[in-house]
Amino acid sequence: MNLNKIVAGDDIPNDIYVIIEISSNSSPIKYEVDKKSGMLFVDRFIPTPMFYPCNYGYINHTLSLDGDPLDVLVPSHYPIKSSCVIHCKPIGILNMQDESGDDAKIIAVPKSKICQEYKNINDISDISELLKKQITHFFQNYKTLEKEKWVEIIGWGNCQDAKLEINDAYNRAKKNSIFLNK
């Protein structure tokens, strides 16, 4: 499976393809796709007994400030299998830092063709406060039992902030020729 052939989106930053690494509500295991082989690897077992509140993945052909592709959380009623690709629209961003530096998380919902329920969700203000609190709580606490690891939540940003981050990460990857097929 060569996930490197998956484009970042049809209309960056308004339209993105998210490669799922971790299903929502799954066991506390951090998976990462190896960008060269496309295979899913176990990164680590998370000692804090928590589950991911949303499907967790990344946008291919992007480079975030931590040196990895840009992370994305995709809320849905159903867990999406690891290594699946889902067509999404960005609605917001959770800005945070960890022991490696800036570590933004884009929040994106499935395109309405996939699920009509998200048709009118266009900004982070359109999702429930409870879901935002669950996401914040997860990231504030999931590393607490790991030595020398920490997370600081900076705050939420809106759809425009998310699109700016996506553009920056896409252009950064392009400039550095990282994750791009030639």
UniProtKB/Swiss-Prot annotation:
One annotated GO biological process: phosphate-containing compound metabolic process
Residues annotated to bind substrate: K30, R44, Y56, Y142
Catalytic function, reaction form: diphosphate + H2O = 2 phosphate + H(+)
Cofactor: Mg(2+)
Disulfide-bonded cysteines: none
GO MF entries: inorganic diphosphate phosphatase activity; magnesium ion binding
EC category: hydrolase
Matching Pfam families: Pyrophosphatase
Major localization class: cytoplasm
Annotated EC: 3.6.1.1
Keyword terms, alphabetized: Cytoplasm, Hydrolase, Magnesium, Metal-binding
Cellular component terms (Gene Ontology): cytoplasm
Keyword Mitochondrion: no
Residues the record lists as binding Mg(2+) 2: D71
Family membership: Belongs to the PPase family.
Role noted for this protein: Catalyzes the hydrolysis of inorganic pyrophosphate (PPi) forming two phosphate ions.
Assembly and interaction partners: Homohexamer.
Protein name (record): Inorganic pyrophosphatase
Organism: Buchnera aphidicola subsp. Acyrthosiphon pisum (strain APS) (Acyrthosiphon pisum symbiotic bacterium)
Gene designation per UniProt: ppa
